[in-house]
């Protein structure tokens, strides 16, 4: 008989025969009847058994969180809180759990995050914890669907590379046979090469690695990056694509994951588009009107971003950043080369992502390399792609975990990562 998922039991007729597999969450043995709470990845159901000698012997031997099989029938006349249960006819232990458990699943014991991460497999069994990742999955799926609808194709680029994407030193070195190599910070260079190849619109979802020695609640050293690049586009086109992709992702999560939001005690609304825009220089004016000193060419501090973000209720763009704080591939503004056709997407004081129109003229690209004091020879495969017809193009890269953290109002990005990699953690 095929397995029945718990969340489909209401679709069955009263009295229908079912087989449920799952974790035995808790058991209550009464005089004549026993009640077991069984959990699978779709929900929890009560199963009731008459206490005949053979059945009672099995139930008494089941440790919490053991894997069990329950055969029985759907009972929609149940007086249980859910109004439905399984009237069990047999139960068997598929795989027994050891006792005691390294981390409680249902008991109201508050463990700190480090303890939870050390026993992550147990932590993820909690409904409110696994809900984060079901929402994250739906968020990503909504973004993917939107990009497909806009004629993007999904690509997969190398994660072992010979040079830094942005020329920095924040790289994890690896030994690639007899050569030195690095884990890629971003698919940026390869996305742009694909514009020269005529792919027109591409996106990638994959790991990115940053060897930055931070240890904050907003940073990871390995994260999931959603990157796009689009031809015959500028920074305004890229911003429109970004805000609509995020809106699509949130719409899908809200539509598909109502129970998960409820289990987290969260109610969210889909953001309206377009998101507000404010230029870098307008931000400076705003800060100075509040009596805050700021020098052109500096990046904004968290406190300064908090001041700026207080003017907005949600997502907003800061545009036209100085060339000095943007990567070499960022297009300068034609009317003021001090500035660039670039943007950061912010949520209050938190940076969500950044993007820009890219340089497409090979001579300007070489000039930008020289300004940033980068060795062109280290990027020859990339530079060559600009010599034979590179279209104007723009794009962005978006961290999935940070977006999820913002959406759910969580205080630590590690909560949105199955197995976080940070300054101190590489296990599990």
From Swiss-Prot:
Q: What is its main location?
A: cytoplasm
UniProt-listed PANTHER family: ASPARTATE--TRNA LIGASE, CYTOPLASMIC (PTHR43450:SF1), ASPARTYL-TRNA SYNTHETASE (PTHR43450)
Q: Give the cofactor note text.
A: Binds 3 Mg(2+) cations per subunit. The strongest magnesium site (Mg1) is bound to the beta- and gamma-phosphates of ATP and four water molecules complete its coordination sphere.
Give yes or no: UniProt keyword Zinc. Answer: no
Q: Which InterPro entries does this UniProt record tie to the protein? A: Aa-tRNA-synt_II (IPR004364), aa-tRNA-synth_II (IPR006195), aa-tRNA-synth_II/BPL/LPL (IPR045864), Asp-tRNA_synthase_2 (IPR004523), Asp/Asn-tRNA-synth_IIb (IPR002312), NA-bd_OB-fold (IPR012340), NA-bd_OB_tRNA (IPR004365)
Binding of ATP occurs at 210-212, 218-220, 351, 399-402
Q: What is the gene called?
A: aspS
Q: Which residues form a coiled coil?
A: none
Q: What is its EC number?
A: 6.1.1.12
Question: Where is the stretch described as Aspartate?
Answer: 188-191
| UniProt enzyme class | ligase
Q: List the disulfide bonds.
A: none
Q: Name one GO biological process term.
A: aspartyl-tRNA aminoacylation
Reactions performed catalytically: tRNA(Asp) + L-aspartate + ATP = L-aspartyl-tRNA(Asp) + AMP + diphosphate
Any single Pfam family the record assigns to this protein? tRNA_anti-codon
> Entry's CDD domains?
AsxRS_core
Provide the binding site for L-aspartate: 166, 210, 354, 358
This chain belongs to the protein called: Aspartate--tRNA(Asp) ligase
In terms of NCBIfam families, this protein maps to: aspS_nondisc, PRK05159.1
Mind listing the UniProt keywords for this protein, alphabetically? Aminoacyl-tRNA synthetase, ATP-binding, Cytoplasm, Ligase, Magnesium, Metal-binding, Nucleotide-binding, Protein biosynthesis
- Identify the residue position(s) of the site Important for tRNA discrimination: 81
